Amino acid sequence: MSVNGAVWGRVRSRFRAFPEHLAACGAEASAYGKCVQASTAPGGRLSKDLCVREFEALRSCFAAAAKKTMMGGS
């Protein structure tokens, strides 16, 4: 396999794992989504870093889920 093919193989495997990782972080994804939704509702004002706490919680959870998968855990 070419070097370029190996890179795309890793990218595809990460994309295939994305739904699993997201499912493992349902509460965090929901909290972030609710924050963004409330900020974009009529009268709401979405701005940078408005939902940063929720985003960081989701990012941390997602990274932990990805690491767990890479280590062979389920």
Curated annotation (Swiss-Prot):
Q: What is its main location?
A: mitochondrion
Which spans are transmembrane here?
none
Q: What are the cysteine partners in each disulfide bond?
A: C25-C61, C35-C51
The yes or no answer to whether the keyword Disulfide bond is present is: yes
Recorded hits in InterPro entries, A to Z, give: NDUFAF8
Q: Which UniProt keywords apply?
A: Disulfide bond, Mitochondrion
Q: Where is the CHCH domain?
A: 22-69
Give the GO terms filed under biological process for this record. Answer: mitochondrial respiratory chain complex I assembly
Look up the record and report any one GO term of the cellular component aspect. Answer: mitochondrial matrix
The record places the motif (Cx9C motif 2) at: 51-61
Cellular location of this protein? Mitochondrion
Where can the motif Cx9C motif 1 be found?
25-35
Q: What does this protein do?
A: Involved in the assembly of mitochondrial NADH:ubiquinone oxidoreductase complex (complex I, MT-ND1). Required to stabilize NDUFAF5.
Q: How does it assemble?
A: Interacts with NDUFAF5.
Q: Which PANTHER family match?
A: NADH DEHYDROGENASE [UBIQUINONE] 1 ALPHA SUBCOMPLEX ASSEMBLY FACTOR 8
The protein, known as = NADH dehydrogenase [ubiquinone] 1 alpha subcomplex assembly factor 8
